[in-house]
């Protein structure tokens, strides 16, 4: 019964937060923002720029402009090639919420990225995480895969448990 009550409470809370987000976007006068708002996606560190260069029409002028290409970290790599996704999972038996994190090398040109550092605040977990997979070195600095390369197309994942999710984003990487 407790699990069911927790599920119902979490569902109601998510609808309440979604409604509050829509109200705040509406209050800020951003109808264009509301069209782009999608709260069903998982957290990601990469912007929504595609890997192809697209020509966009400037509003009002009708002239074309190029989209901004992500900053490159090597001949083959872009800073957005490492993507961090996070999703809610089943809570631990003691009720602490659980989260799954996936860190993926999405480089399309076959680059191998190493020394992946993640902005992670005071990251901690009630569930043990293999420190060779993910560990906090200092405040807001977590190391992925013990600094070893993450080959292109590879995904590294781990689970953690805490009363709230941490905002995880790529701080810096090295491209080989």
UniProtKB/Swiss-Prot annotation:
InterPro entries: TPD1 (IPR040361). GO terms for biological process: anther development; cell fate determination. Expressed in leaves, young seedlings, inflorescence meristems, floral meristems, carpel primordia and ovule primordia. Pfam families: TPD1_C (PF24068). Residues 1-21 form the signal peptide. The keyword Phosphoprotein does not apply. Interacts with EMS1. This is Protein TAPETUM DETERMINANT 1. The gene is TPD1.
